[in-house]
């Protein structure tokens, strides 16, 4: 079942279409329905909306790129809201957001968010298993060296787990209340710590634990 992250990014001024949130980009593009509009000097939300007239979806990336399509390509899925923080350069107030590095601020014509199809795991994974509180690696690669995410407002155990699973990883860990790290395995340099070292509440769920200072609440998809 697809994990839905609580998205709390800045929502731009009202437009004719619906804002769905921040989504991941893929190497072959999440939206491939038209020639992209590129303008790193003066891009606005309205410019991208107009460029994508006739399409069901449109997204802005890197502060100046606009992509259109009728569906999301496999591998694109909801990301953390704070991954989309690059301002639109054509907005003099710099309050509207035009995605981020490999992240799309996604809009569309439907009130319902588009279906996303993350890459499948082989064998499939269905549940998470808590592995314990582990130390972060302070020199070299992190304890979990795959994808990562950060959110001061909406980090949860389920959100991190879904993000890492959909990114293709089976291990995930939460640190400092707001950090999420993914990996295919846990570094041998990370060791089991005292459980009380992981006591920081998650930024998006005060009743959940998201690691501690240089400590990871570590889980595995099984």
UniProtKB/Swiss-Prot annotation:
Inhibits the growth of the fungus P.tritici-repentis. One of its GO terms (biological process) is defense response to fungus. SMART domains: WSC (SM00321). This is Putative fungistatic metabolite. Residues 16-110, 127-222 form the WSC domain. It comes from Chaetomium globosum (strain ATCC 6205 / CBS 148.51 / DSM 1962 / NBRC 6347 / NRRL 1970). It comes from the Eukaryota. Signal peptide: none annotated. The lineage of its organism: Eukaryota, Fungi, Dikarya, Ascomycota, Pezizomycotina. Keywords: Antimicrobial, Fungicide, Repeat.
């Amino acid at each position: 079942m697809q994990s839905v992250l609580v998205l709390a990014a800045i929502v731009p001024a009202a437009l004719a279409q619906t804002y769905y949130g921040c989504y991941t980009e893929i190497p072959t593009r999440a939206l491939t329905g038209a020639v992209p509009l590129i303008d790193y000097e003066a891009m606005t939300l309205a410019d991208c909306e107009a460029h994508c007239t006739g399409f069901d979806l449109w997204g802005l990336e890197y502060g100046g790129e606009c992509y259109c399509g009728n569906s999301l390509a496999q591998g694109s899925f909801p990301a953390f809201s704070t991954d989309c923080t690059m301002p639109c350069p054509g907005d003099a107030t710099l309050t509207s957001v035009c995605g981020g590095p490999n992240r799309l601020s996604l809009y569309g014509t439907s009130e319902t968010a588009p279906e996303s199809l993350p890459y499948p795991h082989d064998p499939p994974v269905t549940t998470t298993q808590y592995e314990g509180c582990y130390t972060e690696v302070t020199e070299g690669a992190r304890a979990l060296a795959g994808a990562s995410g950060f959110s001061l407002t909406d980090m949860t155990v389920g959100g991190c787990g879904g993000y890492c699973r959909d990114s293709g990883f089976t291990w995930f860990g939460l640190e400092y209340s707001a950090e999420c790290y993914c990996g295919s395995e846990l570094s041998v340099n990370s060791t089991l710590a005292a459980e009380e070292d992981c006591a920081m509440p998650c930024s998006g769920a005060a009743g959940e634990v998201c690691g501690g200072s240089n400590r990871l609440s570590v889980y595995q998809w099984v």
